[in-house]
Amino acid sequence: MFCLNTFKSRWPREFQNLKKKKKKTCVKLSIPIRSVTGDAASLTVVVTMYKRDDYVRNKPGGVFSRWQGFARSMLLPKPFSETAELRRTVADYSLISRGLAPKILREAKGNREDLRVGKDFVGSRYRVQESIQGLGVAVNIHDADDISHGQTESIRTRLRSYGRPVPLLKKLGDNASQTITQKKTGGRSKDKKHGFEEERDVSRVEAEENNTNSVHASVLRLSRSRPQPVLERHDDIVDGSDSASVCGVLQEDGTTCLTAPVTGRKRCTEHKGQRITCAPPVKNPPCEEETEEICGVILPEMVRCRSKPVSGRKRCEDHKGMRVNAFFFLLNPTERDKILKEDKSKPKTRTSSTNQEEPGESLICEATTKNGLPCTRSAPNGSKRCWQHKDETVDQKSSENVQTSTTVCGVKLHNGSVCEKTPVKGRKRCQEHKGMRITS
């Protein structure tokens, strides 16, 4: 028992109150009283002291005391004529709600006696159908042409309704009810069904107006910064639905030109005088040799070099300073003679297509010039030399002279050998390898 009392003092205050609920305390006070005659008497007074939890708690709602009478009277099942409290609080409500009344009340019918038509109460979960006319001071009743009806929950629909024309609003005024839909915390199924029917009616009327093309109002498109007015005609151009507002010419990539035509014409300035299905003629691509920029040096395999030349030059980095047919004459004379003998030993019965495809394999003059270089002219059919070296004999010792020379060019050839030609006077390389370096 001792341990229980010690732990009881440590418990929180809420648990102590749950364990033992204290009753109210009565205090008796005896006050001595002396009468006029001088006799002594005593007056006993019993004072009842309640605990804090016994008092009636009031929430801090004293600020809203003016509104209590108005709200209570609106929720009571009594007509307006029998509610004196409502008539008394109308003046206070009008002074307070000058700016709030136009948002709550709209198109008041003036029926004061029957306030709750259709059993629609005033509250956070119901809607107001009819209200008192002139309940707030300076309540501006908007004109029927300027009021947005129907879908009040949708911000996009509310913004679009500002541009509706008069005939559309008149149709909406006949069909839609003059109601304001409040935010429902626990709405009923009937209210939801009624709201959906109103939305369907409004959307149906808008679709009919747009189909007849009688409405050319501007549409407000929402953006992150601010709404911007965009014409419906501009939307039609983007979508391509209106064929008269676009050029419509079929382009090369298969798409349709969506540019607006020139005033008074059917086409834009770019497609002036063209038909819709008329595509511009496609030019035949030129030959590969004309379009491609390649090095072009004939390699020992009789194939052109396809590498791109260095900017500002005709050859690539590997064939710098070389002519197109340089490799054919840079070979050793013995190997050159072998190639010529092989060409002679091949049968001459070739098709015309083969001769057209391989024009570079025609015979070359076998003579050697005075500076030791082979002649680059082509020999006519049936002869071994060109017209200049036709009467000269073949210099058999030209190769030996090149090999026995003390100074040679030294440039490494494509087949792995070294150029053994004598360089030009005052230079380190021969005429064919002018400006080239020796690659290790």
UniProtKB/Swiss-Prot annotation:
Location in or out of the cell: Nucleus
Polar residues bias spans: 175-184
Sequence ranges of Basic and acidic residues compositional bias: 194-207
GO MF annotation terms: DNA binding
Keyword Manganese listed: no
A GO CC annotation given for this chain: nucleus
GO BP annotations, alphabetical order: regulation of DNA-templated transcription
Cx9Cx9RCx2HK repeat placement: 247-272, 295-320, 365-390, 409-434
Residue stretches making up the GIY-YIG domain: 131-167
Sorted UniProt keywords: DNA-binding, Nucleus, Repeat, Transcription, Transcription regulation
Region span, Disordered: 172-216, 339-363
Disulphide-bridged cysteine pairs: none
PANTHER family with a match to the protein in the record: PROTEIN EFFECTOR OF TRANSCRIPTION 1 (PTHR35133:SF4), PROTEIN EFFECTOR OF TRANSCRIPTION 2-RELATED (PTHR35133)
Domain notes: Contains a bacterial GIY-YIG-like domain.
Note: Plants over-expressing ET display dwarfism due to short internodes, late flowering, reduced germination rate, increased anthocyanin content and reduced xylem lignification.
Function: Transcription regulator that negatively modulates gibberellin-mediated developmental processes. May act as transcriptional repressor of giberellin controlled genes. Binds DNA without sequence preference.
Protein's recorded name: Protein EFFECTOR OF TRANSCRIPTION
